[in-house]
Amino acid sequence: MTLPAFKAYDIRGRVPDELNEDLARRIGVALAAQLDQGPVVLGHDVRLASPALQEALSAGLRASGREVIDIGLCGTEEVYFQTDHLKAAGGVMVTASHNPMDYNGMKLVREQARPISSDTGLFAIRDTVAADTAAAGEPTAAEHSRTDKTAYLEHLLSYVDRSTLKPLKLVVNAGNGGAGLIVDLLAPHLPFEFVRVFHEPDGNFPNGIPNPLLQENRDATAKAVKEHGADFGIAWDGDFDRCFFFDHTGRFIEGYYLVGLLAQAILAKQPGGKVVHDPRLTWNTVEMVEDAGGIPVLCKSGHAFIKEKMRSENAVYGGEMSAHHYFREFAYADSGMIPWLLIAELVSQSGRSLADLVEARMQKFPCSGEINFKVDDAKAAVARVMAHYGDQSPELDYTDGISADFGQWRFNLRSSNTEPLLRLNVETRGDAALLETRTQEISNLLRG
């Protein structure tokens, strides 16, 4: 049995060919054997196939004697939070996040919301399912419904001093995913006026797949910000583990610049803490962390690596330019809700707009944003780039792909973990012309 839905960090595949209820039940049985004793938290996103997949997964777990705590329709971070908060043995979120319509998937964690990825149990689960030893009888253990979100909401609100918040006008675009439900529950506790875009959860995704990185999806948020004169805008993906920001002019803010901003917000509350960041773009983050009295810690990108490094370093915050933001008190997990609350607090307390907060940073360290290249021979393409710049003796780092520092500019080039792509990021020290030149130069070399 080939199981293409099992990836390095999660399970993702087409329904029903690569992921279906029979497979979900078998995954439940195999997962039960991987976890310590205790209940398992299950939740699902708005996709039409998700409730049935969760029910099948639950049946497999309960047939193996596992009590299941069903938290229902939710975001991925709610499964992480409840797994830790309820001291469960593990948790599974049934979601395909921003993947195409016909996809679904699962994100799995063990106790304390620790990720289950390829080398920490996911491939062992795959092998058990593939060996066809994961058949199960009738469910014997109980399933309990727990849809009370009070503890989660209180935790989110604990990150900000509500007495300092101003009556901001915020555009919120849930993309017909699950984020709108949480915004509505938070709204009575906050002084903000919300302009709701694509707000209702709808697994048919009438306004397109909730992926704010797609230009057509950005346009709706940007347009609403400008039309309503909002202070800033926020858009989420389907399971709202990532959030994206737009300033009051409707301009999309590159995720890189949010990492330094959020680091400073957290360090103001927890002085001297460590901040974990990825190697793709670094100069702005390092400077902002150090200016705030924190200690920057470099780590390979990817949630499993960031969370592990944060735990070993006792870091207060971790940020990736891909809009994943991790918080120590949130079980070291990523949240798409905590960041916008912190940014709203920062805007309120500083009296400055989001545009103003990031503009100087964007001028000081302009970046290319991540550019993807489909290449037939990745090694040969990278070799061309390194041969071209080798005589300039850059400072090299191999934490994640290749990072090359030339003093006034740097680049990171890495292979995608999930697709046949090379990903390029370039930044300079305040030189937009140099950025354009070097980005074009490397792009030409990669294309051969």
Swiss-Prot record:
Keywords: Exopolysaccharide synthesis, Isomerase, Lipopolysaccharide biosynthesis, Magnesium, Metal-binding, Phosphoprotein. Belongs to the phosphohexose mutase family. Binds 1 Mg(2+) ion per subunit. InterPro entries: A-D-PHexomutase_a/b/a-I (IPR005844), A-D-PHexomutase_a/b/a-I/II/III (IPR016055), A-D-PHexomutase_a/b/a-II (IPR005845), A-D-PHexomutase_a/b/a-III (IPR005846), A-D-PHexomutase_C (IPR005843), A-D-PHexomutase_C_sf (IPR036900), A-D-PHexomutase_CS (IPR016066), Alpha-D-phosphohexomutase_SF (IPR005841). It comes from Xanthomonas campestris pv. campestris (strain B100). This is Phosphohexose mutases. It catalyses: alpha-D-glucose 1-phosphate = alpha-D-glucose 6-phosphate; alpha-D-mannose 1-phosphate = D-mannose 6-phosphate. Gene3D superfamilies: Alpha-D-Glucose-1,6-Bisphosphate, subunit A, domain 3, Alpha-D-phosphohexomutase, C-terminal domain. Its EC number is 5.4.2.2, 5.4.2.8.
